[in-house]
């Protein structure tokens, strides 16, 4: 057997072994082969149909743990039709076995070289869900026909969440680091700005969204100050989503590194971390909370899970100097 044939045989054997491993992982994640009853219960809960799990915990807040000034600002949400549709679509996609095997194989090969975001952009997968159209309108306290001039979505990813907000704005601007995600944003006709150019355009934005970006930023306080300076005075608003617990890390070339400016938020519960973000971050840079809510931060799944879920705190922030009512 020549060296080329041997290498080919070894590669085919590796692929077959890898596929078999993925199938066994998928099988084990069903919970049948997990002996520990606590772990098994947790995994079954994460993979179960929406009708069989308690989704109210995705939105639950204990107001007694919030500081007094924040309590009347909390907006209670619940599972709605758009959120359900995203989860059900993710569950369906996770059953496409050969597609998921292909995704997993490509991710394994590329992950040492490029970020997971870029891999997802290349594969056309990994869409995120932060809020529905109705939840966005309720959070910003606007009517369905409300329209403003400019939206800027920082770190827009594939533009899925941008698309939810876009109908309320005449012009939609986005930023993104990943080259593959940039291509997807251009296909959706959003106006792409450089990551260091959006605050130097010569105009202000009515709304800037910074969704699950603050904990992936090397200089988060500087970012917040730049956002504050870039909003329309008086009526401009920042929509800020942060994963709770707040744990800042940067993904660089497939590696995770600690940011230069590290923010540590005190508190163990969702409510205590909301208090911490408000007092230790937002107020320090000149923002105050106008409204906030608890929402699930959802991502399309893979061969192991139907979908991924993190706890989000989503805020509407205004400049502390603003004396004008909300839009």
State the predicted function of each range.
Residues 209:
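A conserved beta-strand element that flanks and buttresses the S-adenosyl-L-methionine
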Residues 152, 157-199:
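Class I SAM-dependent methyltransferase SAM/SAH-binding core
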Residues 212-216:
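A short His-aromatic
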Residues 235-244:
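Conserved beta-strand signature within the Rossmann-like core of class I S-adenosyl-L-methionine
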Residues 222-236:
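A short glycine-rich, Lys/Arg-flanked "PGG" loop and its adjoining helix->strand segment in the class I
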Residues 2-147, 160, 242, 250-327:
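N-terminal accessory regions of S-adenosyl-L-methionine
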Residues 149, 170, 206:
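Conserved acidic residues
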């Amino acid at each position: 057997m020549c060296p080329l044939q041997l290498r080919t045989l070894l590669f085919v054997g590796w692929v077959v072994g890898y596929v078999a491993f993925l199938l066994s992982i998928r099988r084990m994640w069903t919970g049948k082969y997990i002996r520990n009853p606590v772990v098994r219960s947790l995994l079954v809960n994460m993979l179960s149909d929406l009708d069989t799990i308690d989704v109210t915990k995705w939105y639950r807040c204990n107001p007694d743990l919030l500081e007094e000034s924040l309590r009347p600002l909390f907006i209670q949400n619940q599972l709605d039709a758009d959120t359900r549709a995203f989860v059900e679509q993710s569950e369906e996609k996770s059953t496409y076995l050969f597609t998921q095997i292909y995704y997993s194989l490509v991710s394994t090969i590329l992950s040492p070289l490029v970020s997971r975001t870029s891999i997802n952009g290349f594969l056309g997968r990994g869409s995120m869900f932060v809020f529905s159209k109705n939840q966005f309108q309720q959070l910003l306290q606007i009517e369905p026909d409300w329209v403003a001039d400019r939206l800027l979505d920082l770190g827009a990813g594939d533009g899925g969440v941008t698309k939810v907000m876009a109908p309320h704005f005449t012009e939609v601007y986005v930023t993104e680091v990943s080259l593959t995600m940039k291509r997807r944003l251009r296909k959706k006709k959003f106006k792409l700005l450089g990551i260091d150019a959006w605050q130097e355009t010569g105009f202000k934005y009515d709304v800037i969204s910074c969704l699950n970006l603050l904990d992936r930023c090397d200089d988060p306080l500087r970012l917040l100050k730049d956002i504050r300076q870039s909003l329309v005075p008086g009526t401009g608003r920042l929509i800020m989503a942060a994963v709770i617990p707040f744990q800042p890390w940067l993904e660089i070339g497939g590696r995770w590194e600690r940011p230069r400016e590290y923010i540590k938020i005190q508190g163990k519960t969702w409510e205590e971390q909301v208090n911490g973000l408000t007092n230790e971050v937002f107020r320090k840079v000149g923002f105050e909370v106008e409204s906030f809510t608890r929402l699930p931060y959802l991502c399309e799944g893979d061969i192991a899970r139907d979908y991924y879920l993190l706890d989000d705190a989503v805020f509407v922030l205004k400049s502390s100097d603003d004396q004008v009512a909300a839009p």
